Amino acid sequence: MSFKLWREGRSFSYSWKGTKEVPAIKPNCGIKVLYEPHNPIVDLVFVHGITGHRDHTWSADRNSDPWPKLMLPSRIPEARILTFGYDASVIGFWRSISRNSIGDHSNNLLSALSSFRSNAELRPIIFIAHSLGGLVVKDALLSSRASPEPHLRRILDCVRALLFLGTPHYGADLADIGQRLVKLAGLTTAKTNRKIIGVLQRDSEVLFRIQKGFQELLRSQQKDGTRTLEITCCYEELPLMGMSEIVPSESAVLHGYPAIGIHADHRGIARFASADDPGFVSVLGELRRWIGQVVPTDDELEKEVGAVKRKRSNNRWANRKRGGKSCGDTGAITIWGNVTRSVITNGDQIIQGNLVFGGSRA
């Protein structure tokens, strides 16, 4: 990678060519909705990687919309599509950059997602993560598991599947590239984030902690007989600018889980220009398969009933404290959940099960 490329503020996951104009930087932090159907049954959450952007990482061209926004709504209309952004810059010549660690970014993801889903706390989640974003997602799930806060623990309970795109589970050459950039920056006044670079080293203690904790999480799910996570790992088949693969398959693939090779380099593995792209076809196939499995189980419906009862009880108590009527006094019908497996409240009555609207069965 050239000094000129990084001096001009180019994103690792955007472009390695040093001849294009640099567009104005768009907002990148937090959650952004790319598509929201009337009655979603699942949240797809996209998380970019090192020096990435919540829009540009997923865009075949800098001036185009992200492919999840362009190509998924017509093919997976029942899914809400979200993208999460964070400052994962390694070096900044003309601007300040975040000094956040992986743990900071993962906690921000967990908190932002929990807050954003406050009205849909039980909706299933599928993560699609590129590069470093996969480590952020895994660490967020570990934080969710260990959190004393119910609303944060609930995130892990809702996660159904993880799709990793070039995630360096066991380290990557990204670290070597980053170290060279940091040394280069030492000759200038550039700002650097060594915390991000350090985690990508193959002997990184942080990387070891995340991977060890994640494997323990998967084993505990299998041992407890709870719903286990569906996982697919995609790896790059092409080198980047004549180099070796940035994240080779032996680092990008978790042992014992399905692996898919995508005929692209580390940048292109997250960008699809058309619906005919073989990489997109593979990713779409996995998403459709998982979404077909997200219909709530009986145990999950029982949990949903409990959540509805608690919410109704809290609302009734708050209304009576204010001297008003409770929700149960209105006689109105409220539907919680999706039309396939739902929970309906009518006054003090709660109905759960399969619902066929416009038919004779409820």
Model-derived segments and their meaning:
Residues 28-78:
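Short, surface-exposed "cap/lid" segments of acyl-processing enzymes
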Residues 56-62, 94-98, 139-143, 174-180, ...:
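Short coil/turn segments at secondary-structure boundaries
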Residues 48, 91, 101-215:
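Serine-dependent carboxylesterase/thioesterase catalytic core
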Residues 222, 237-265:
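Active-site-adjacent alpha-helix of alpha/beta-hydrolase-fold enzymes
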Residues 74-90:
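Conserved alpha/beta-hydrolase
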Residues 50-52, 86-91, 132-134, 142, ...:
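Conserved beta-strand elements of beta-rich interaction domains across eukaryotes
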Residues 271-287:
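Post-His helix in hydrolase/transferase enzymes
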Residues 3-21, 309-362:
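Long, low-complexity intrinsically disordered regions enriched in small/polar
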